[in-house]
Amino acid sequence: MYKTGILNSDISKVLSDLGHTDQIVIADCGLPVPKDVKKIDLALTLGQPSFLEVYEVLKQHMEIEHVTIAEEMEVDNAPIFEQVTKDFSEIEQVNHETFKALTKNAKAIIRTGEATPYANIILQSGVIF
């Protein structure tokens, strides 16, 4: 049994399997999951766990070279937008419909209990060397 780090075996496995440019998504509880994409459902109740709780943990354990968000997040979810833009200087913003289409390329979508609009992000894996 792990003493530290990510205890969720599905998330741990997905992260360890990521190669350069592979993508995972952290999603609010409302984002549709394409049928051929692995869904890791962490949602317990509305708001738990939050997007930011999951995001902060993944940031610590993943080499991230690129992020994509829905442009609507800037206006409709300023608190999460501010945190993400504080962490990454370059962020690709696309409309929400395009964002949803891009999720079909993800290795996995991690569904949180987040219940605020547009609390979704695509994280693209970098390399550690």
Curated annotation (Swiss-Prot):
Location of the active site: H20 (proton donor)
Q: What class of enzyme is it?
A: isomerase
One GO BP annotation here?
A: D-ribose catabolic process
> Where is it found, in Gene Ontology cellular component terms?
cytosol
- Specify whether Isomerase is a keyword of the entry: yes
Sequence intervals crossing the membrane: none
Keywords on record: Carbohydrate metabolism, Cytoplasm, Isomerase
Would you say which domain of life the source belongs to? Bacteria
- Name the catalysed reactions: beta-D-ribopyranose = beta-D-ribofuranose
| Location(s) in or outside the cell | Cytoplasm
- Function field: Catalyzes the interconversion of beta-pyran and beta-furan forms of D-ribose.
Assembly and interactions?
Answer: Homodecamer.
Q: What is this protein called?
A: D-ribose pyranase
Please state the gene responsible for encoding this protein. rbsD
